[in-house]
Amino acid sequence: MMDFNLPSIFVPLVGLVFPAIAMASLFLYVQKNKIV
């Protein structure tokens, strides 16, 4: 019966962690391939 606590954990996870991983992976991709 703890489903009401799921969004309060899941929203910051998607809103902060996912963009951080996406930015980090994009940065590493650019550094690896020397696009810039």
Swiss-Prot record:
HAMAP family assigned: PSI_PsaI
Any matching Pfam family: PSI_8
InterPro entries for this protein: PSI_PsaI, PSI_PsaI_sf
Similarity comment: Belongs to the PsaI family.
Function: May help in the organization of the PsaL subunit.
Any one GO biological process: photosynthesis
Compartments it resides in: Plastid, Chloroplast thylakoid membrane
Protein origin, superkingdom: Eukaryota
NCBIfam families: PS_I_psaI
Chief location of this protein within or outside the cell: plastid
Encoding gene per record: psaI
Name of this chain's protein: Photosystem I reaction center subunit VIII
Record's bilayer topology term: Single-pass membrane protein
Cellular component aspect of the GO annotation: chloroplast thylakoid membrane; photosystem I; plastid
Organism per entry: Oryza sativa subsp. indica
